Amino acid sequence: MAASVCSGLLGPRVLSWSRELPCAWRALHTSPVCAKNRAARVRVSKGDKPVTYEEAHAPHYIAHRKGWLSLHTGNLDGEDHAAERTVEDVFLRKFMWGTFPGCLADQLVLKRRGNQLEICAVVLRQLSPHKYYFLVGYSETLLSYFYKCPVRLHLQTVPSKVVYKYL
């Protein structure tokens, strides 16, 4: 038989499980669990939803049918700073989505080669070339100052979003 020994204002005494003392009872949470499993892919619908090549394939096809969107050596055995690279990737993606509002046609590809950071993007032809030149120079200068390394942007323009298939 399990019994607990509580020492407090009432002194040490042996009790069975009761709610008289705070140390002698257990708490039970009755809120529902919010950790639901969801697949990280686009759901199949009536065939009227346009998706890109990256969205059409599930994540388990990475390195088989599609490539990595972030290329760096942080995940190799013995390498450090994998968490910092992930945070930097999130910041870079949000920065680029904010700098080119509504102009990015697909996901960014981030490449780290030595000390250089390369950002590859497919943009829509919504702005004039002069505005794109300004935004590229602005982004490269500001990100080079933030990361203390050379940052290069490689942009490819398309007239409209590239649709791989309809789901």
Swiss-Prot record:
Any single GO BP term: mitochondrial translation
Keyword Ribonucleoprotein on entry: yes
Presequence range in chain numbering: 1-35
Keyword Thylakoid found: no
Swiss-Prot/TrEMBL keywords: Mitochondrion, Ribonucleoprotein, Ribosomal protein, Transit peptide
Subcellular localization(s) per the UniProt record: Mitochondrion
Cited Pfam families: MRP-S24 (PF14955)
Domain of life: Eukaryota
Alphabetized GO MF terms: RNA binding; structural constituent of ribosome
Listed GO CC annotations: mitochondrial inner membrane; mitochondrial small ribosomal subunit; mitochondrion
Family in the record: Belongs to the universal ribosomal protein uS3 family.
Subunit relationships: Component of the mitochondrial small ribosomal subunit (mt-SSU). Mature mammalian 55S mitochondrial ribosomes consist of a small (28S) and a large (39S) subunit. The 28S small subunit contains a 12S ribosomal RNA (12S mt-rRNA) and 30 different proteins. The 39S large subunit contains a 16S rRNA (16S mt-rRNA), a copy of mitochondrial valine transfer RNA (mt-tRNA(Val)), which plays an integral structural role, and 52 different proteins.
Name of protein: Small ribosomal subunit protein uS3m
Organism annotation: Homo sapiens (Human)
Lineage: Eukaryota, Metazoa, Chordata, Craniata, Vertebrata
Gene field: MRPS24
